[in-house]
Design a protein with these regions (language model features):
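Conserved HGGG/HGGXW glycine-rich cap/lid loop of the alpha/beta-hydrolase fold
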Residues: 7-58
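Active-site loop/oxyanion-hole signature of alpha/beta-hydrolase fold enzymes
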Residues: 36, 40-43, 49-89
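Flexible "cap/lid" loop of the alpha/beta hydrolase fold
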Residues: 96-104, 108-142
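Active-site nucleophile elbow and catalytic-triad environment of alpha/beta-hydrolase enzymes
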Residues: 160-176
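Short beta-strand/loop motif that positions the catalytic acidic residue
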Residues: 180, 186-188
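Conserved alpha/beta-hydrolase "acid-adjacent" motif
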Residues: 193-198
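Catalytic histidine neighborhood in serine/cysteine hydrolases
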Residues: 199, 203-220
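Catalytic active-site module of serine/aspartate enzymes centered on a nucleophile-bearing elbow/loop
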Residues: 215-264
Length: 264
């Protein structure tokens, strides 16, 4: 445990060789799942780091609502603790946090991968729900209580805070996204919680962004297609930038209306 912004926080320090990749978990989750997804596939080229955000996993909660801006502050504090710039891979809430962190401190972020993320809460196809009673809640609360210093009795409060967050944040605009100054890969399932229109709007708004929509997949795309998702992410993190393609349109630095598309 280390102190981030005065709060005791569980961290996983970088191990191995290569650039640092910081894994940012989703809401009502913790770093364990992200480490399982990426440990074997990325550790040969990168040093993986992670931390559990306030009220998640092994990090205790504190009074007050959850806010993405505060989560980004936590992430900035963690990157400053590491003492070097890092790639970010964030899933769901972690993707929102990665985006905000990249906007706030591009000097600390090499590249950012946003998986199943949204830039505005109205981009969600359905309103997030989670039961506060019944078998599904009981199972989640049991797992939460086994890990959290706050114990199982705090589980309902965390769910309430998370649902309130999902319903009201983030509130970014495409004009905000246009200020992103680090390379970004946006990844989603073709049946994700954010609409494809919302995901594509994010892709169009972020300068130089790359987009990967994986077929036959949902918000659990990292679990459903781990090999494919990891290959795409690894290629993005290791590739030379800026991207060059045979028939650039969006990426063309100069375009003339009516220029023929190369014969492929």
């Amino acid at each position: 445990m280390v102190s981030l912004n005065g709060h005791s926080t569980w961290v996983r320090r970088p191990r191995g060789h290569g650039p640092v990749v910081t894994l940012l978990h989703g809401g009502m989750s913790d770093s364990s799942s992200m480490l399982r997804r990426f440990e074997k596939r990325l550790s040969g080229d990168f040093r993986l780091a992670a931390f559990d955000r306030r009220g998640h996993g092994r990090t205790p909660d504190r009074p007050g609502a959850f806010h993405y801006d505060e989560m980004a502050d936590e992430t900035v504090a963690f990157l400053e603790y590491l003492g070097e710039p890092s790639h970010l891979i964030g899933h769901s809430d972690g993707g929102v946090v990665a985006l905000l962190t990249a906007m706030r401190r591009p000097d600390l972020v090499r590249r950012a991968v946003l998986v199943g993320a949204n830039y505005h809460h109205d981009g969600l196809v359905i309103a997030p729900e989670f039961p506060l009673e019944g078998p599904e809640f009981d199972e989640w609360a049991r797992d939460f209580g086994e890990m959290s210093p706050d114990g199982v009795e705090h589980a309902r409060e965390v769910v309430r805070k998370a649902l309130a967050l999902f319903a009201s944040e983030p509130t970014l605009t495409t004009s905000d996204l246009a200020t992103v100054a680090v390379p970004v890969l946006i990844m989603s399932g073709d049946d994700d919680v954010a609409s494809l229109a919302h995901t594509c709007a994010m892709y169009e708004a972020i300068p130089g962004a790359q987009l990967a929509v994986l077929p036959a997949s949902s918000h659990a795309v990292l679990k459903e297609h781990p090999g494919l998702a990891n290959r795409i992410i690894r290629r993005f993190l290791l590739s030379e930038l800026p991207v060059t393609t045979l028939a650039p349109i969006r990426r063309a630095t100069h375009s003339v209306r009516g220029d023929p598309i190369p014969n492929l």
